[in-house]
Amino acid sequence: MDFKHVSVLLEECIENLNIKENGIYVDGTLGGAGHSSEIAKRLSDKGLLIGIDQDENAIKAAGEKLTPMKERIKLVRDNFSNIDAILQNLEIDGIDGILLDLGVSSHQLDEADRGFSYMHDAPLDMRMDTRQAVSAMEVVNSYTEKDLENIIKNYGEEKWAKRIANFIVDFRKEEPITTTHQLVDVIKRAIPKGARIDGPHPAKRTFQAIRIEVNGELEIINKTIDDAVRNLNPGGRICIITFHSLEDRIVKNAFRDLSNPCICPPEFPICRCDRKPAVKIITRKPIVPTEEELELNPRARSAKLRVAEKI
């Protein structure tokens, strides 16, 4: 199966995982297995890579790509937020590193019938896991106007959220919005012409917001980080790639809280709560793609990598 996906910040991720040849590593967002194949190459027969993805196509494609190294790889179709249960089922007590590449993959964007992209006309879907019930079509056609406004404003950081939500609700009174290009047309009508001249595609932020809502992307990040860190062996690292400011802010704050968990009032001269740091932050500032990488893969432009190490 052809699963086209260019791995972002590949060398930087591999370097920061500090891979030990006999270690156990998790790629929580398997995708096209670009990161996974490089991790697996560095493992001995005693090492193990666990590749997780909720996308059935990703699992199938990765299985084919990783066949030469299959003895040191286990693939799991699940959401990385279930890392605790996944490791328990595999009877694994601790891991030496975990990588999360958040957001939608290049393959999912390019696979027109998945409905992730505003560039292709397709059924409104946007489900990363096609087994789940709620799709973008349900969100767009059944959520209240206020709920749509909040989603588009909070998850898309879209200044025209109120107008877009209003236009969506008005349109669906006449007929349901069932395709991506229908939704794009509604969004374009909602945003004043002058505001559409500069900047990204007018539908970009709204599509991002709806995708995040459909897949519960932001809700699971904090829980996943806590669970992942708890399962890391001392010295093990967690590497997370984000693609927009909402994700990056959550990761940054989660790492900060885990590295400085003191809950004492600020007026206390010394810590009395005795809460110990769980990690040390490796990247005080996020790692971003080089100009060379951006020339090869413009979609990497907004990527940021943050790394923390279990104490």
UniProtKB/Swiss-Prot annotation:
It holds the Pfam family Methyltransf_5. GO terms for molecular function: rRNA (cytosine-N4-)-methyltransferase activity. It is found in: Cytoplasm. S-adenosyl-L-methionine binds at residues 33-35, 53, 80, 101, 108. InterPro entries: RsmH, SAM-dep_MeTrfase_MraW_recog, SAM-dependent_MTases_sf. Keywords: Cytoplasm, Methyltransferase, rRNA processing, S-adenosyl-L-methionine, Transferase. It is an enzyme of class 2 (transferase). Its EC number is 2.1.1.199. It catalyses: cytidine(1402) in 16S rRNA + S-adenosyl-L-methionine = N(4)-methylcytidine(1402) in 16S rRNA + S-adenosyl-L-homocysteine + H(+). Transmembrane segments: none annotated. GO terms for biological process: rRNA base methylation. One of its GO terms (cellular component) is cytoplasm. Coiled coil: none annotated. Belongs to the methyltransferase superfamily. RsmH family. NCBIfam families: 16S rRNA (cytosine(1402)-N(4))-methyltransferase RsmH (TIGR00006). Specifically methylates the N4 position of cytidine in position 1402 (C1402) of 16S rRNA. This is Ribosomal RNA small subunit methyltransferase H. The gene is rsmH.
